[in-house]
Amino acid sequence: MTGAYAASYLPWILIPIIGWLMPAVVMGLLFLYIESDA
């Protein structure tokens, strides 16, 4: 996979990932960290 090919479809994939997938992953990891620590 070349950089130019990835750049053509990366923005519209990256926007929803950053928008709702990353916060969900961060919340899940924080929850697991807090639960395992308690």
UniProtKB/Swiss-Prot annotation:
One of its GO terms (cellular component) is plasma membrane-derived thylakoid membrane. One of its GO terms (biological process) is photosynthesis. The keyword Transmembrane helix applies. The keyword DNA damage does not apply. Keywords: Membrane, Photosynthesis, Photosystem I, Thylakoid, Transmembrane, Transmembrane helix. Its main location: membrane. The chain crosses the membrane at residues 12-32. It is a single-pass membrane protein. It is found in: Cellular thylakoid membrane. Disulfide bonds: none annotated. InterPro entries: PSI_PsaI, PSI_PsaI_sf. NCBIfam families: PRK11877.1, PS_I_psaI. May help in the organization of the PsaL subunit. Belongs to the PsaI family. This is Photosystem I reaction center subunit VIII.
